[in-house]
């Protein structure tokens, strides 16, 4: 043997193969992309290969501003792309009156549905491909980068949400004021025109808001989310919901402020949350007739409220009743309303624990041991027989009471106070989440801690302060959101409604918030909602369910103009996704994962702040 060769390391063919495979795959990808680009240039550019043509083939009505809400004009359609256009392989911009396009909450199509139980305010999505638009939702004229957090809690640019109507209608209640080129949010509301602090102080005198035992809150009829904004001072996370109605921009204002919110209504279907999700539910003059339909809406609140959770109500008949009492006057109508309300609460076995102007507070029981005898005597409502109280995607509300855990299991379902709650999940211990274990939960938590550290180290996305509103399109156990908890962000954790096991209950047990969703449809939110979109395995999940083009166009609709996207998936899937994002004018780059950190897959990063 040559002495010069005897100290050379022995090469392992297997290691060489593993080392060079990622480079070979990426080289092949770029070669194919180049060939594809050349092919596109030689074809009819009206039709991007292997993709549905971005086209608009029929008229559609959508209001542009609040001034023309009553009679929206026909949508202005773009002319067909010219064959000589060098950009015709790109998706076209939608017309300008698409700036606030809500595919599943469109006022013109809603008119064909019944007003009974506000059904027309429910989700009504385009159900066939011909009714979906293949265009990019434009930003409003004069759009500016939103104020950074926490400044955004108080200010929003008028051009970003160009609706004066709410400021005019609610100017005496201090919801929002228009001052020059910006909106100012002074913290008022219908029940607290003098400011939300004094209002919350009344609740604080009864409930332990600062103890960590109350972490997740549902605010029904949220206005501009001033209540939820103030509760952040106590590290309480509030899901603020309201329908798209005459105050059409209230949820949009909340999101522009950097607060968790989505379009939602108590109507026909269950709210898209699991049972036992919220520590407190709040209604301040939320315009819900709680005693209608034999108390059906309160039964739905009971479903999503945790054992020993609180229901806080202000406004008629509560506030008015106290006011009349102070003035030594009485109102028969209001008294009757309150008696009906108390009757529903007796049937639900709730306990009134405080009545202090302007609120009344009830508490849900920890179990139904004492309640079962009463329910049997009353005969209505009974306990629900449904085997899955967490099923809530397009499921009609049920006139029954969701059973609570057996008294012997009560200790197993008790939540820790925040922030210990983040890593303590009772549903895992009770075995209600099939296919998951405590060990698996811990491994998932650690994996996402490493992944988020990798994101921040390599891409500088998280620590630069640019991102406030975040959505995780396939949240799993909420590991991504949990890893972000140290950053000034909030995360909407989405769990696909048909995914097994159903993990959204785990997300809420951790003190996080989220919703069920079908990504073949549009999300119940306004355009330009999120600064950062995270999609882990989403496209693999939906490849055989619907066209991924529509999912990507929905992501474009809800992403802010200078926002970012992180897509993690199989390499072959991301090649298809990347071809589409190129046509969306997104600046995307693919990265192989570091196998020493991650198990498999590829990352596609889109950063639209880079021009």
UniProtKB/Swiss-Prot annotation:
<feature type="glycosylation site" description="N-linked (GlcNAc...) asparagine">
    <location>
        <position position="289"/>
    </location>
</feature>
<feature type="glycosylation site" description="N-linked (GlcNAc...) asparagine">
    <location>
        <position position="411"/>
    </location>
</feature>
<feature type="transmembrane region" description="Helical; Signal-anchor for type II membrane protein">
    <location>
        <begin position="16"/>
        <end position="36"/>
    </location>
</feature>
<feature type="topological domain" description="Lumenal">
    <location>
        <begin position="37"/>
        <end position="611"/>
    </location>
</feature>
<dbReference type="GO" id="GO:0032259">
    <property type="term" value="P:methylation"/>
</dbReference>
<feature type="glycosylation site" description="N-linked (GlcNAc...) asparagine">
    <location>
        <position position="587"/>
    </location>
</feature>
<dbReference type="InterPro" id="IPR004159">
    <property type="entry name" value="Put_SAM_MeTrfase"/>
</dbReference>
<feature type="glycosylation site" description="N-linked (GlcNAc...) asparagine">
    <location>
        <position position="408"/>
    </location>
</feature>
<feature type="topological domain" description="Cytoplasmic">
    <location>
        <begin position="1"/>
        <end position="15"/>
    </location>
</feature>
<feature type="glycosylation site" description="N-linked (GlcNAc...) asparagine">
    <location>
        <position position="68"/>
    </location>
</feature>
<keyword id="KW-0325">Glycoprotein</keyword>
<dbReference type="InterPro" id="IPR029063">
    <property type="entry name" value="SAM-dependent_MTases_sf"/>
</dbReference>
<dbReference type="GO" id="GO:0008168">
    <property type="term" value="F:methyltransferase activity"/>
</dbReference>
<keyword id="KW-1133">Transmembrane helix</keyword>
<keyword id="KW-0808">Transferase</keyword>
<keyword id="KW-0489">Methyltransferase</keyword>
<dbReference type="Pfam" id="PF03141">
    <property type="entry name" value="Methyltransf_29"/>
</dbReference>
<keyword id="KW-0735">Signal-anchor</keyword>
<dbReference type="GO" id="GO:0005789">
    <property type="term" value="C:endoplasmic reticulum membrane"/>
</dbReference>
<keyword id="KW-0256">Endoplasmic reticulum</keyword>
<feature type="glycosylation site" description="N-linked (GlcNAc...) asparagine">
    <location>
        <position position="97"/>
    </location>
</feature>
<protein>
    <recommendedName>
        <fullName>Probable methyltransferase PMT19</fullName>
        <ecNumber>2.1.1.-</ecNumber>
    </recommendedName>
</protein>
<comment type="similarity">
    <text>Belongs to the methyltransferase superfamily.</text>
</comment>
<keyword id="KW-0472">Membrane</keyword>
<keyword id="KW-0812">Transmembrane</keyword>
